[in-house]
UniProtKB/Swiss-Prot annotation:
The keyword Secreted applies. Residues 1-32 form the signal peptide. The keyword Signal applies. Gene3D superfamilies: Gnk2 domain, C-X8-C-X2-C motif. This is Putative cysteine-rich repeat secretory protein 31.
Length: 263
């Protein structure tokens, strides 16, 4: 039996069991905080073409997946490239949410690899879950990318003065963006490029986060510019909504009236 990337039966079984076991554990322990790992969206990069079963591209892909799935996931992100400049080049990048590390990040990565079957045998594809995104491409990713951004929002509108709410929420997100790119916001010797807090907006508590993909950004200015750009899209995405987010492969933000992160 073959999945979209023709992974071996053994690898598919290992990934599936890892996803099921970890997700059951997470659901049981964090459901009260609305901490889920729901599938959000995917995009097949059709222009990059397809690969054939048994090809060198497939072998490179499977080798990458094996190496990543057996890593520690300590930093919550990874970027692996092989055969640069050749038709068989495989590039995998994943970023887990700022509160998802180690086993939680591994589980999300495994779910992402399994989810790539939505793009059968495509060399390129991106999939987003609540706690991570996984991108597989046949090209090297070396710059900020806005082409794959998309919006999500709560269909319910805020009660009261929506204009005032929008202003406060955008200011809060802008403040988090500054915190995410502070020089002293370090983690494991690298800039965290992530910030999350809560704040009273009117009579309700608002929870929010911002994050940049750590491996893409060599300089904090790139992260800052990315966050500024997507926060400026707030009026299109989230005008007067009780919750919303802009996601992509370079940076993202989210806000809700309920806790969605681990403390």
């Amino acid at each position: 039996m073959h999945n979209s990337y023709s992974l071996s039966k053994r690898l598919v079984l290992v990934l599936f069991l890892a996803v099921v076991a970890t997700q059951l554990f997470l659901i049981r322990n964090v459901s009260s905080l609305n901490l889920t790992n729901a599938y959000l969206h995917h995009k097949c990069l059709i222009s990059q073409g397809k690969y054939k079963p048994g090809s060198q591209y497939e072998k490179n892909l499977n080798s990458h997946i094996d190496l990543i799935i057996n890593s520690t996931f300590r930093n919550g992100f990874g970027h692996m490239t092989t055969a640069m400049g050749s038709p068989n080049m495989v590039n995998i990048i994943f970023q887990c949410r700022g509160d998802s590390y180690q086993s939680k990040c591994r589980s999300c990565f495994a779910a992402g690899i399994s989810g790539e079957m939505r793009c059968p045998r495509n060399k390129g594809g991106i999939i987003w879950f609540d706690q991570c995104f996984v991108e597989i491409t046949a090209i090297e990713v070396m710059e900020v990318n806005y082409d794959n951004n998309f919006y999500m929002h709560n269909p319910n509108k805020v009660m009261g003065d929506a204009k005032s709410f929008n202003k406060e929420t955008m200011a809060f997100l802008e403040q988090l963006a500054l915190e995410a790119t502070r020089k002293d916001n370090m983690e494991d010797g690298m800039m965290a490029l992530y910030s999350a807090r809560e704040k009273m907006v009117g009579t309700k508590k608002l929870y929010a986060m911002v994050q940049c993909t750590r491996d893409v950004f060599m300089f904090k200015t790139m992260c800052k510019e990315c966050l500024e750009r997507i926060i400026s899209q707030y009026p299109k995405c989230c005008d007067g909504k009780q919750g919303g987010r802009v996601l992509g492969t370079s940076c993202n933000f989210r806000y809700e009236f309920y806790p969605f992160l681990r403390t």
